[in-house]
Structures are given as C-alpha cells and as structure tokens.
Amino acid sequence: MALPLYLVGLSHKTAPLEVRERAALDPVVALPAALSALGKGVVLSTCNRTELYGVGSPEKARAFLLSRGVAPRHLYVKEGVEALRHLYRVAAGLDSLVVGEAQILGQVREALFLARRQGATESLLEKAFQSAIALGKRARSETGIGMGAVSVAYAALDLALAVYGDLSGLSVAVLGAGEMAELFLTHLKAHGVGRILVVNRTEEKAQALAERFGGEAFGLPALPQVLRQADLVVASAAAPHYLVGPEDLPKRAKPLFLIDIALPRNIDPRVGDLPHAYLYNLDDLKRVVDRNLRARAGEIPKVEALIEKALGDYMEWYAGHRVREAIRALEAWARVQAAKAQPEAGPVELEKAAGRLAHPFILGLKRRALDRVGGPPCPEDCLLYRLSRT
C-alpha cells in the first residue's frame, strides 16, 4: 500500500500576501478548529505558508482551506512520498522565502507540539515531523545552507541598509516584541543605530525587549507619538487587524520608510499611497532575498542529498511499521521453536537462538514490504504472517 501521508497548502510561491492572510491560522481559535476538522493532522502556519498535513484523504483539508476564501489555483496537494519530501524541504529551509533561514525549524517543532497538545497526531505523522526536525538540524550543521544571517528579519535589515546606507543617525521603531522583533533588533544592533523605539500591546514585554537592546519602550496607545519620531518602522506584531493606517501618518517634512513583516499585516496597504510614506511588505523582500540566495546556491545540492537519505530512512522505517504485527508474531514463533530445539538452554541462550532464527525472515519481510511501498499489499507478507501464527 502507498504511504498514506498528504499535504494541502499554500505558500509565498503560490499565493499573494492578501490570500496568505486569509489562510493564516491563529493558535488560539483557528488552529484548534483546523485540527478538529482534520481529525488527525499537523498544521504549519507561518508568515509565508499555511500547510495541513494528515493521513488518509486530503479532501477535508482542502475543503477547510477553501472555506477560508482560498481559491483552488493557490493550493497545492501532495501525497505519499512527495508530501514527505516537501516537509523535509520546508524543515531544511529550501522552500523558505529566505533559503536556509533557521526560524522555520522552530515553527515546524511548534506545529508538532501544538498538534500533540490537541491529541491530533499519530505514528506516521509523529515520525515524519520528528525526522524532519532532525533533518533540518543536520542541514544547518553539515552544510552551509544557513551561513551568514538568513531570516526574514535580516532581509528587512538588508532592505533598510539599501535605503539608508548608514543607520547610525536614525530613529527606528519596532512594532511587536516577539521572536521576529528580537531577531531584527539583534541584526540592527550589530549595524549600529541611533535610537530604538519598541512598541507592544503589552508594555512590560516592550520594556523587557527594549532593555536588552538599549531602546525605549512604549505601549500601543503611544504608537501615534512614536510614528512621529521614527525614520524607519519595522512591523512584526501579532495582531488580527491593522495597527497603522493612513490617518496615523499626517504629512511630514521627511519621508518615513515602513517594512511590514507581519502576517496578518500590521500596516494598511493604503499607507503606501501617501506621498511621504514608502511601504514594503513580505512580497517586496523577495528581491532582497534573491540577491542573498546566490551566496548559498552551491549548498542546495548537499541539502537535497540529505533529504533523499532521510526519505530512504523513513521508508525503511515505514516498511517495518507496516508489518510490525507480523514481526512480533515471527519473534514469538522463533522463541517457541528455539525452546523446542534447546529445552535445556537458559533464557539468554534461547533469546539469542530465537533472534538468529527470526532475523532472516524479518529482513525478508521488511524488504518485500519496502518493495511494495506505492503498490498493492504483498501476498508473501500475508503468508508469512499466517505461518508465524501457527
């Protein structure tokens, strides 16, 4: 039988930003609803993708995403080994907007954790995601795919440097106090900046982040005041609606550059129509990313080789998984036969003898199962299973 994994999703490669916003799943309400609709599954929802992984038929997952206003042309559906290969490419950073970025690996790990918490995983999904996480670590430790600073946050900084060149005299406002904001501030601090203004719904979180980077902290009510002082705004807050609109940016003498790396977006796209405001979003970062990719392009074949090895390892595990009951029965049968042949032997000797007897049968059983992955059930497996019960 075929590997029954499936994947239904959309990403920056297939859907524009406004469509990805509709499909994004917040962890409090929408994510549990998605897992409930799937029955068993894992949901990976990031700023650049929403993907539903499960076992069996992909139709429920497809219907769920269509119900959120996603057009069929924006979706991709992969099944069997191709679904697993895609997951491995995602975890390794090959399918990211910023190839080689490390943040996606933590997001894959978090997706598995949330599915476990909902009781939505099962053995094939568990193994797939655990092996994907292990592969992602190997890709970054054994190749140069992640060399240098590679992340959406770094791409945002790269864009800021392209615009301003020197950041030392600027006031930079950061909306949000999460992982993306922290990453951006880490890169920003390394390049030197005049003034850092951190704005967050929870002022205590803004204070903690500002203290780390020598900045000033503000609650959300102070946002209009902060915008008047800023030269550059980087938005990465987790918010269900726009935090900055055209009405928040009265005409000013000097231009304001805004980079929105949040999903859903923090900044109303109409802000980009203002004569004194220059707005960039996630899709705009792709040009920056394409330039950075050239430095890591030579590492991609090395990562792809690791992926193919990991696929082989998974399919070997799956071959054993498919026939685990038969293997257990063979092992029990071998113990009985060993006891009959050596009635005077002790437990250790009997266990070794049973292992020697069962080993070639188990290898053959796994090999035949592996040969049939993607095809019909193996009649020899069924025969061996029946024989092992005698």
From Swiss-Prot:
Question: Where do the annotations place substrate binding?
Answer: T46, C47, N48, R49, S96, E101, A102, Q103, Q107
Could you say which residues are annotated as the site Important for activity? H86
GO terms, molecular function: glutamyl-tRNA reductase activity; NADP binding
Q: What class of enzyme is it?
A: oxidoreductase
- Residues annotated as binding NADP(+): G176, A177, G178, E179, M180, A181
Q: Which UniProt keywords apply?
A: NADP, Oxidoreductase, Porphyrin biosynthesis
Q: Which reaction does it catalyse?
A: (S)-4-amino-5-oxopentanoate + tRNA(Glu) + NADP(+) = L-glutamyl-tRNA(Glu) + NADPH + H(+)
Q: Which domain of life is it from?
A: Bacteria
Q: Which GO terms describe its biological process?
A: protoporphyrinogen IX biosynthetic process from glutamate
User: What pathway annotation does it carry?
Assistant: Porphyrin-containing compound metabolism; protoporphyrin-IX biosynthesis; 5-aminolevulinate from L-glutamyl-tRNA(Glu): step 1/2
| EC code(s) of this entry | 1.2.1.70
Q: Which SUPFAM superfamilies match?
A: Glutamyl tRNA-reductase catalytic, N-terminal domain (SSF69742), NAD(P)-binding Rossmann-fold domains (SSF51735)
- Subunit structure of this entry? Homodimer.
HAMAP family cross-referenced by the UniProt entry: Glu_tRNA_reductase
Note on file? During catalysis, the active site Cys acts as a nucleophile attacking the alpha-carbonyl group of tRNA-bound glutamate with the formation of a thioester intermediate between enzyme and glutamate, and the concomitant release of tRNA(Glu). The thioester intermediate is finally reduced by direct hydride transfer from NADPH, to form the product GSA.
This protein's domain notes: Possesses an unusual extended V-shaped dimeric structure with each monomer consisting of three distinct domains arranged along a curved 'spinal' alpha-helix. The N-terminal catalytic domain specifically recognizes the glutamate moiety of the substrate. The second domain is the NADPH-binding domain, and the third C-terminal domain is responsible for dimerization.
Q: What is this protein called?
A: Glutamyl-tRNA reductase
Query: What is the species of this protein?
Result: Thermus thermophilus (strain ATCC 27634 / DSM 579 / HB8)
Name of the encoding gene = hemA
